[in-house]
Amino acid sequence: MKKLKILMAASECVPFAKEGGLADVVGVLPKHLARMGHDVRVVMPRYKRVDRERYGLKQLPGVLVVPMGVIGNQYCGVWEGRIPGSDVPVYFLEHEGYYDRDGLYEVNNEGFLDNDNRFVFLSKAALELPKMIGFEPDLLHAHDWHTAAIPVLVNTTYAADPYVGGKATVLSVHNMQHQGNFYEGLMDVLGIGWEHFTFLGLENNGEANLLKGGLYHATVLNTVSEGYAREMQTPEYGWGLDGVVRERAADLYGILNGVDYEDWNPEVDPYIAARYSAADLSGKKLCKRDLQRTFGLPERDDVPLFGMVSRLVKQKGVDILAEAIHRILALDVQFVMLGAGEPWTHFYFGDIKNAYPDKFNIFVGYNNPLSHQIEAGADFFLMPSAFEPCGLNQMYSLRYGTLPIVRATGGLDDSVENFDEKTLVGTGFKFWSRDAGALFDTVGWAVHTWYHRKDAMERLIANAMAKRFTWEDAAARYEDLYGRALRKRLGEKEFARRYGKG
């Protein structure tokens, strides 16, 4: 297939601005697509935290004019940079009224009241940008509700646009829970006509739902694991849009995220106490001692050490962990936790720390070096998520020989193979029911294995460390997805004429 011109629009991208896993995908996937020969450009807001000098941004001449319906034209400057370690251009939209704020989406857990206008602006600006930079994309790739208006606009207001009209669109859904549901008056800002405010359009319980519009209008859809692609079609995980997803099931694909093994590799990790490999695990024992020391726990080789790095919110399963933690700590184990989230969790697990000073400690906040140290020093890594579209820490854990204990949902189910005690096949421990009893039973199973099945532990660690989830593989699947989108948009004959049969 002929190499493509791809415009990718997103609300965040590492290293410039990050709140979740979306940023990792947008910061890494374009680099690998570019290495395959594709011309990929990224567009995102220039938030207050995006330092122009640090990233060597250069302002483009002129001003981008963005029509915002009843609001009127809005204007922004455009700055150009590069994703570090690549030649992939990133275009930053500078609009002080929308983006010169401390948070990306909220401050003090309160979402900005104009998030609807902020991200409709991002979507429209992304469609105006190609004229400014002289770049006619073959395909537009939107991510989550923040840019889900792009497929809608391409099919309506911009249908005759010489740069983006009639183009194939891909919408990646990273989390169905967040949908961009706003007051119906947003239709007048979108400027696409009220005939699209219907049950088979953007209307959702009397509001305008940007993700719903994108799900209906995108040429093809994908999410970040095959498991989550199935779950999105159920009432439990579809968050009210499962019917829409089922309607588009033939155009929905699951692509598991990759891991940046340049950053997550115990053989070269600069943050851990000692390097190690599958062939020589002696360094992992030193990492365990160092982790115990860092968290103020007794330095014991004869006890299994559990680790957890997570946002402390219900989605991540901290509610069932809170219910099970006393039973877990009644076992001869140690447990370290890194994360922040709902205020009650800080107090609750702080009390657990005081009640079990030799067994449990928590660092409230996020610390990247410490997250590496937990992955390297722990024996087991806990992820009891209510739902997990992809998840990355379980894949990091496998590389570090730290056996994941996960609830079998989404990407966790896809990437962790359950331990079989007879065949010694597997890479971790899984449970299915979302309750404290199932979590405790699985932790108990892992503890029993650690104490009484050293042969099984050795095999599990070897199995885990042999697994690979590369971005090269993920990028190849995205390339195939782009081909599917173009074939659907153009038809097989026109696709072959323009891009070849590959």
Swiss-Prot record:
Entry binding sites for ADP-alpha-D-glucose: K18
Organism: Geobacter metallireducens (strain ATCC 53774 / DSM 7210 / GS-15)
MF GO annotations: alpha-1,4-glucan glucosyltransferase (ADP-glucose donor) activity; alpha-1,4-glucan glucosyltransferase (UDP-glucose donor) activity
Keyword 4Fe-4S: no
Gene Ontology process terms (BP): glycogen biosynthetic process
Top-level EC class as recorded in UniProt: transferase
InterPro entries, per database record: Glyco_trans_1, GS/SS, Starch_synth_cat_dom
Family according to the record: Belongs to the glycosyltransferase 1 family. Bacterial/plant glycogen synthase subfamily.
EC code(s) of this entry: 2.4.1.21
The protein's name in its UniProt record: Glycogen synthase 1
UniProt key word Glycosyltransferase: yes
